[in-house]
Amino acid sequence: MRILEITSDLDGGGVDRLLYDYCSRMTNDIQFDFVVTSKSEGILEKPLKELGCKIYRISQIREGLQKHNNQLKKILTDNHYDIIHDHSGYKAWCNLRVAKKCGVTARIAHSHQAFMAETTKQKIMRILSTPITKIYSTELFACGNDAAKWMWGEKAFNNGKVYIMKNAIQAERFNFSPEKRERIRCEYNIANKFVIGNVARFSYQKNHEFLINIFAQVKKIRTDAVLMLIGRGELEDTVKAQVETLGLRDSVIFMGVRNDVPDLVNAMDVFALPSRFEGLPVTLVEIQANGLPAVISENVTKEMTISKDFTFIPLTQSTLAWAKAISETQRNESRNLIKNTIYDLNIATNELRTKYLTIVQRKGK
């Protein structure tokens, strides 16, 4: 079986890591290739190539629709793919239309977001594009129930027309380790600090500006607090400037994109995620496997919540209210809450493999 995954980049974000984790466990019987529109090489491209995956780079749609379509058409005509799996949500119709014209009979549109903040123009585009995407797709996927309902509609979800592809993780990699905690905290000279962590792309969605303002309030309550930010993105320089303006440079650690996130979360005392919108964030599954408590925006779905140490707060609450909740949180749980659940990759991989096979067999009839 040959599957072509289409995504914006492979730079280590939640969706990228999810795809890598799934693919790395299925390459023995499935050939996965990738189409990306990013001009720069992502950190996951080399590991995927080592697994035997091909990475195709094509232009973005805004650089010219015909150019984009022709490049994708060449990939599809030069190779035989049983499935095309597009991760751009309601925007997938463009690629799926090309795939249909090229004879790809199994076409998946995947929603990774729920209740996204939109301008009027964006909302109109979604409302107009979603029905077209449904026409050109043969399968609808989503990362969770909320993402399924928001993107594909209550009716499609209730009628079982949407498959929930779990944002699963290698649960055992996130087991809490006192040794790793001590090593990392010593390495960054934060052994006696109260460490607040965040793993997210620096983007409007993840709301780093609000997080920095919250942290400024935390420092007034706990002078020993430090903020560990893992990731990068288009707003990173803006956030760094904000940190400088607020005089927090010595208390904020910019880690960049890291491959050792399972180790780094051991060093944290609490996780903070004030996102404006989310589908079902992989990071929250990961930290539950580590036993790390979290303070989270109410805009984030609760459907994957197993931990009793998750606190949900509205974004309308003040930065001081957030700061108090974070400052009062203590790391109590250390057991892996994800292992042997539906979010354990060992279980979820077999389920997804079966789904792919079922799709191909059904379309082959």
Residue ranges and their predicted role:
Residues E63, K67, K149-G153, G160-K161, ...:
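Acidic anion/phosphate-binding donor-loop and adjacent secondary structure
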Residues V35-V36, P293-S297, K302:
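Short hydrophobic beta-strand element within catalytic cores of glycosyltransferases
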Residues G13-D21, F194, N198-Q217, E234-K240:
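A conserved mid-protein helix/loop that constitutes part of the nucleotide-sugar donor-binding site
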Residues V257, R276:
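Aromatic "clamp/platform" in nucleotide-sugar-dependent glycosyltransferases that forms part
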Residues D86-A92, S111:
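Short His-centered aromatic/hydrophobic patch
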Residues G14, R331-K365:
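A charged, aromatic-enriched C-terminal amphipathic alpha-helix characteristic of glycosyltransferases
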Residues E5-K67, K161, E234-E236, K355, ...:
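N-terminal strand-loop element at the rim of the active site
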